[in-house]
Amino acid sequence: MSQGQGGITLDDLIAQADYLKRYIDSLQRTQLELLESINSIDSAKQAIETIKSGNKEMLVFIDRKGYLLAKVGGIVGDKVTVHLGLSYYAEVDLDSAIKILDKRKDEISKAAQNLNNELQKAASTYNQIVDILNQIQQAAARRQQGE
């Protein structure tokens, strides 16, 4: 079909499929980051609960991947420093910290759900385009066999 007839070209379909594939990959990377953030919040809340229980020692990761742990002793206190966003932190009591973390987790969970919805739409559109491209390829193969 030509552009003049209101259709799209094969090259347009291929370009759209390529764009959607890259977009889906980007959404999946972002989704993974959001899930990692949720897991980090859960870990932070567990640490607060450990502090609240009166435990004076805790194992903490020294690096992000968990290659090195250190036992930290002498944990005393009823306050922790919580990340509020951007470059802002606040020292708050343990219960307030849990409330802040719960709110942040809810925000991230909503963002993850919205992202998942967008990912499903993009994947559906991508699959439709791939189906069309496969049909075009099969039709071309049949025509070539008929020659």
Swiss-Prot record:
GO process annotations (BP): protein folding
Domain of life: Archaea
One Gene Ontology molecular-function label: unfolded protein binding
Primary localisation category: cytoplasm
GO cellular component: cytoplasm; prefoldin complex
NCBIfam families named in the record: prefoldin subunit alpha
Function text: Molecular chaperone capable of stabilizing a range of proteins. Seems to fulfill an ATP-independent, HSP70-like function in archaeal de novo protein folding.
Name this polypeptide is given: Prefoldin subunit alpha
Organism, scientific name: Saccharolobus islandicus (strain L.S.2.15 / Lassen #1)
Source taxonomy: Archaea, Thermoproteota, Thermoprotei, Sulfolobales, Sulfolobaceae
